[in-house]
Amino acid sequence: MKQNNSAAKQYFAFQWHITDECDQRCKHCYIFSENNCKRPDSMSWEQMQETFYNCLDFCRVYDRLPCFYITGGDPILHPEFWKLLGLMKEHEIPFTILGNPFHLNDEVCRRLKEYGCQKYQLSLDGLRETHDWFRKPGSFDITLEKIGCIRRAGI
């Protein structure tokens, strides 16, 4: 979706929850809350394509540029995650990933950047003791380490 007059258009942001899958069990997460007994679910590739093109159509109708915030659970765990990023790249759509840092390394971050990832949003829930209580022991230090991977990739 190459735009020649992009300076004149405003972005319309879509926050897109593509999967409930996550290998963390953060205390405050709605997906795994005690009253939520459903099995984790993910969108199929067909649903993802339909949603993607519906969002593009919406933006055409309302003269906006699409921008996606891809989230989940942890979106990188979706089996079609990289395929979706390929679709974003093919259409030159800017996107941000909202996920946890546990599956990031220099190679993954380099790939994210190559596909066009502009930002990677992760959480710090306070200082070490508070963050590790909400998430899991050691996660504060892992998060800080993974911020380095994100920075080195230029995200």
Language model features with spans:
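Conserved alpha-helical substructure of the radical SAM core
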Residues: 1-119
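A short acidic, helix-capping loop that chelates divalent metal ions and anchors anionic groups
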Residues: 35-39, 128-134
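Anion (oxyanion) recognition and catalysis
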Residues: 89, 151-154
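Conserved phosphate-donor/acceptor-positioning beta-strand/loop module used by diverse small-molecule
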Residues: 122-124
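Gly/Ser/Thr-rich helix-start
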Residues: 73-74, 127, 137
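Glycine-rich S-adenosyl-L-methionine
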Residues: 135-152
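Hydrophobic anchor at the start of a short beta-strand
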Residues: 95, 154-155
